[in-house]
Amino acid sequence: IFSKVRYEKISGTDKDIPLITNTKLYSDNAYYANSYGKGGISYYVLQNLLGDDLFFKSLHYYIDTWHGKHPGPYDFFYSINHASGKNLNWFWKKWFFDWTYPDLSINKVEKYRNGTKITIENKGGLPLPVFLEITASGKTTMLRSTAAVWETGKNLMVYNLNLPFDSISKIQLGNEFTPDKFKGDNTWAP
């Protein structure tokens, strides 16, 4: 994921073109960021989504099936779908065909019954895992959700926590591996 920073720079711009696009049509910056940055990050997100065992099982199925042949992108997509037993077409569409970019934000934090309701917004439309670090009463808790939370196409997801609203001192969205174009809306404090 060494190319995360470079990909973040071009994400959401006219250089952030769908991965399915023939690389001969890329400019130099777009070629590097898409081929290495965005491409590599898509596999990281897929691995996070499937879990290590299923990801590597599916990848080995693809490699074994297509060894010595000339697979195209669709062969990869269908092989992973078949081996994982999951219909990941929603994932392939957003990562490889659509004009999406990485931008998650903390949309709203509010008191909800006896706890706290945290709403995360996917502004860029790219399915990404959600990592939330919550500091409350001097303790830090990490919440994690895979990119599957965006499978239905909705751009909002909600955490309802049994954590008193007034005890929260900080909420931080993201981690060092997940790209985000606009980080200014990734921190919340009362």
Residue ranges and their predicted role:
Residues 1-121:
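Hydrophobic alpha-helical and helix-loop surface patches within well-folded domains
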Residues 56-57, 71, 104-105, 127-131, ...:
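Extended hydrophobic-aromatic, low-complexity segments
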Residues 109-174:
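Beta-strand-rich binding/interaction modules
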Residues 122, 185-186:
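Asparagine-centered polar/low-complexity signal
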Residues 139, 174-185:
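Short acidic/polar inter-strand loop motif in beta-rich domains
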Residues 188-190:
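Short beta-strand edge segments in extracellular beta-sheet folds
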